[in-house]
Amino acid sequence: MKRFLTRTLPCLTGLSTVLIVLGMMMWRYLDEPTVLPLLTSSHEDLAGEIALVNAAFARAQTTPPLSSVPAADALTLARRLSLSLTGAPPSLEEIRRLEALPAGADPVNAWLDHLFADRRYADYLAERFARAFVGVETGPFLVYRRRRLVTWLGDQIAINRPYDELVRQLISAEGLWTSHPEANFITVSVVAGGGGPDETKLAARTARAFLGVSLDCMQCHDDKFSDRWKQKDFHQLAAFFAQADTTITGVREKRTKDYEARYLGEKSGTKIAPQVPFLPELFAAGGSRREQLARWITHPENTAFARVTVNRTWAILFGRPLSEPVDDIPLEGPYPTGLEELAHGFIASGYDMERLIRVIAGSDPFRRESRSVDPDKPVTAEQESTWAAFPVTPLRPEQVAGSVIQASTLQALDGSTHIIQKLRRYGETRDFVKRYGDRGEDEFAEESGTIPQRLLLMNGKLVNERTKPNPVMNSSTRLAHYAPSDAKTLDAAFLALLSRYPTNPEREHFTRLLEGKEKKARERAMADLYWSLINSTEFSWNR
């Protein structure tokens, strides 16, 4: 077949040539050829740390027995990782590479090797963390500055820069927001219409994002529910940002500037000196106020910094944090199972983000199925709450869009994708999320699907454009033309859409839909199949 296509290609022009090329490309994935396997590397040094984490969860999982929830297969694990770390499921091209792994290779670490080398991972993780750092506020200047910051974050994540270094540079950044994008952590808080950065906004974000402490309400009064936090804790933290000033040369330190605030019950404001809200023995003088704060936050003995980072990373991988809310963790505990083991391992690794992801993905909770093997004994709420089964959670809006877009293209839409395809994907994702509804900063709050969301998947522009008969742009039509058999067609469609093979009942049902149909009728049948699977519950959930 390949030899025939190669000899015929020079004789054709125009659309015929394009279709032949697409057929040649698809044949690689439909006929299950020998595909270059993923690079595999040994990560035996992780075994001890993963064992500590697994032991902690085993102690907490007393009932029901763990044997009722088996280990997930390689395709399920790859789908979880791709959705969590790139915002889209694996392509059929990538799945064939996964299936070509040598026997005995660990699919999780092999897949992570693949994802960490893909710029999609860095860009997507940067966007997820940017929500905690600077929120999702809009406006022409804010959007551009935020985008510059996200790009910078992606550059740091791509080289696996130690997370503590990254955060120190964010908090203490100086310079123009164009040439020093990290300074946009400060500039996005600049009050509209002039003025310097908003110290209170920076204090609130810093406390939540880097300490896992909710001090927002303490801006106006002491904590009404405990004696732990006082109004002074908030304003003394805000005072660290008072000397950050914005000028024509960008963010600079204005050492003579003081911070003033009015405490509850007082008639006038007062000057407030900076002071950390806990663990003052870790604080060291020297440098600007923001440099001092950054060193204290990332001090190895300030475990709060590691805890909130671990909690957010866990939530990105599972769709649900260990401790809820994700950015409000009690300083003195008690802590949820696994959090302390992961936090101390993160610190010991030198705040290695890729290693943290490998440890979490290598743990028993991540590698388990989300369903019981016994249909008469389904997974219980207790099993999910103790992580004895993988929690089933709805996909985020951009993950739903990414799934539709990737499923319609059998090749991976990765960092090497042509700029035209990238721009199309960006525009389609932006429009879909706008209509589907962005979760905003509170991205891990439990939400149920809405009727408008279901209607958007049923009748929306993205699904229609990506499933309708189109031999150049859509995989549904290309499968209808080039797959050598109905069985191969169904295998490819299910792998592209759901990252699994069809069950026997599914195969029987959809074979009847396809058998005997040719050309236009087969194109329409494949479009219907794609539409049906996109509108299935399984498509829009992480399992």
Feature map (PLM): residue ranges:
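Structured secondary-structure scaffolds
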Residues: F283-G287, Q292-F305, T309, T313-L317
